[in-house]
Amino acid sequence: MTKKLITIIGPTAVGKTSLAIKIAKFFKTEIVSADSRQFYKEMNIGTAKPIENELNQVKHHLINNKSIHDRYNINDYEKDALNCLNAIFKNNNVAVLVGGSGLYINSVIYGLDEIPEINLEIRKSIYSELELKGIVKLQEKLKLLDPISYNKIDINNPRRLVRALEVSISTKKPYSSFLKKPKKKRNFNTIVLGINQNRDLLYDRINSRVDNMIENGLIKEAKGLYNLKHLTSLNTIGYSEVFKHIEGDYSLNECISEIKKNSRRYAKRQLTWFKSIENSKWITPDYNFEEIVEHINNLINN
């Protein structure tokens, strides 16, 4: 029997984790995370990691497995995720992959595209421009060079932004053109479930999640990491805004408002990315779990 990877996608705060746990428990299997921030053991509240009770219900892989001091990229993740899946498939016919990072999901399902070697002088030049002119100028440049990537990637993440620009400039081809086609054959079949809902309801969920993060101690967590804010892993929603609050650029209310706004924008980019994943079945958070299981079993048996 061909192994099956049940992949759960969707925007931030929509309820992917709880669905993944239900499915993993039903099929008596394990979960591999595809979240680009939950690797880091120092970042907890701001990354909305599964809570201890959730982690105890089902074995999770690639959560809290790295330090923010470690160098860790998408190529490393692809290898680690596949190794985890191979280990799971030794004892199970089914595994679960869940996350909101589209590039990480794609790396597991399709494999990474081969991108030519990058001119390091171009990389240095882009980082210099970032330092001198700020992130908005680089965002505008990417919008001109590669509007698809501009709408898909997290353009507020300097590392992701620089990566898209350095590839586009070095190769004279849009970064997005290297991410279009499956390159590697996998030893499993993929069943994709997308979870989403009405935009206003989703935005309410996002705003509520941010409020909960603040109540649970996000400000204190970020203050403890402030001296490490130069690390690329901390250039991310939830932490960047609190750092600006610490520096006096934002009041607390402005900080919270910015986190909510940037999270909503991120959700929009996530959905743009996930539209490119074929054969996805989309559901809403008020799903009927028995119907989901029936759908999965039909695909497994056929």
Where are these predicted regions, by residue range?
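Phosphate/pyrophosphate-binding catalytic cores of soluble transferases and nucleic-acid-acting enzymes
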Residues: 1-302
